[in-house]
């Protein structure tokens, strides 16, 4: 009997010990889901330009520049994204530097853009050959140096066949997502006879289709087209842009973010046919982001967009694009918000006219925003 009592007490003690180890709060603290959804945010800004007035404003002394105030209110948004992408509408040819019509910026300008949080440079635009073959090649050299030293990637321009294959499409992996970028331009202001350096061109649909197919073979989760296209200063996209967008979605592109018109154009989404390749049922299209920073003052050219493309993978492993976030920006010139170039989020500053040095710029921002943002979306 004593032995049975002893055994019973031992069993009870062991049971209490196990119960203590497996109490509900302990189980909760150790819980880990078998799968979790992944998310990725990619933000895009428009034309980063450098007119002569900007060069003069930023120059501190010979070889010394200060661009830092220009993105003071923007850089936190760039850094908050998992990946930030900008259209670099200038060359890095070395001194002397110049603005429109042949853009040649100091090397520090590209470094500053990267300092603000931009991770990928888009080089396919109409100004990339403004300084000829030598200017384009030196731009490539500087971008390669930044890639080696800082991990900054680039696409749209290549110096040889190997670089073309590596950057068209440009593929990167972040947060478990494999993303492919296909960047191309409608043309260039200068025509070159040499094969290299080569800019990706919109007219060569076979090469664009081949780039999309390479991206698919390489396992891209999402393919984004970044065309430099459209008519300058037009708020509505053209028929040619619409036809090209249809071609891109039919070829397998999942999202389209455009530049070049220097103004914000309408946004839409295109339904994908079941006969089309692709990973999402509807492809968002932003026809033009507008400028990012420039000295332009023509109607609508100071209003611009930052687009935040948010991508998610659900518990089943399926990719989806969340509603596109549009952040309206205003590029204030010297004498406006303050005595320098400043890119500001419009909604953060509406109702704060007392912060402005020049009231005309504030009124222009509010009027332009209300007029342009009113009817900028649609679906097909």
In which residue ranges do the predicted regions lie?
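Acidic, metal/ion-coordinating pockets
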Residues: 21-380
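Bacterial Sec-dependent N-terminal signal peptides
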Residues: 1-22
């Amino acid at each position: 009997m004593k032995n049975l009592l002893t055994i019973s007490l031992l069993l009870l003690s062991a049971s209490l010990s196990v119960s203590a180890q497996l109490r509900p709060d302990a189980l909760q603290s150790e819980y880990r889901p078998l799968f979790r959804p992944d998310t990725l945010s990619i933000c895009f800004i428009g034309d980063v330009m450098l007119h002569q007035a900007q060069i003069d404003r930023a120059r501190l002394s010979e070889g010394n520049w200060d661009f830092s105030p220009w993105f003071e209110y923007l850089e936190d948004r760039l850094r908050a994204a998992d990946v930030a992408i900008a259209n670099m509408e200038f060359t890095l040819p070395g001194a002397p530097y110049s603005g429109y019509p042949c853009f040649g910026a100091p090397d520090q300008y590209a470094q500053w853009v990267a300092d603000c949080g931009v991770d990928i440079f888009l080089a396919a635009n109409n100004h990339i050959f403004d300084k000829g073959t030598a200017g384009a090649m030196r731009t490539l050299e500087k971008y390669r140096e930044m890639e080696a030293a800082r991990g900054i990637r680039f696409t749209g321009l290549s110096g040889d066949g190997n670089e073309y294959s590596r950057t068209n499409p440009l593929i990167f992996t972040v947060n478990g997502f494999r993303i492919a970028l296909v960047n191309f331009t409608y043309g260039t202001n200068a025509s070159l006879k040499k094969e290299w350096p080569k800019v990706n061109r919109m007219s060569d649909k076979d090469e664009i289709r081949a780039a999309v197919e390479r991206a698919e073979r390489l396992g891209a989760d999402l393919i984004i087209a970044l065309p430099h296209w459209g008519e300058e200063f037009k708020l509505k996209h053209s028929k040619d842009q619409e036809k090209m967008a249809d071609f891109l979605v039919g070829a397998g592109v999942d999202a389209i973010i455009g530049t070049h018109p220097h103004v914000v154009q309408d946004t839409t989404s295109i339904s994908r046919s079941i006969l089309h390749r692709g990973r999402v049922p509807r492809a968002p299209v932003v026809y033009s982001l507008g400028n990012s920073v420039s000295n332009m003052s023509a109607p609508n050219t100071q209003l611009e967009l930052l687009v935040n493309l948010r991508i998610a993978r659900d518990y089943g492993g399926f990719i989806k694009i969340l509603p596109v976030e549009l952040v309206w920006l205003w590029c204030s010139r010297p004498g406006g918000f303050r005595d320098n170039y400043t890119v500001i989020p419009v909604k953060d500053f509406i109702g704060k006219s007392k912060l402005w040095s020049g009231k005309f710029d504030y009124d222009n921002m509010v009027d332009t925003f209300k007029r342009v943002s009113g009817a900028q979306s649609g679906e097909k």
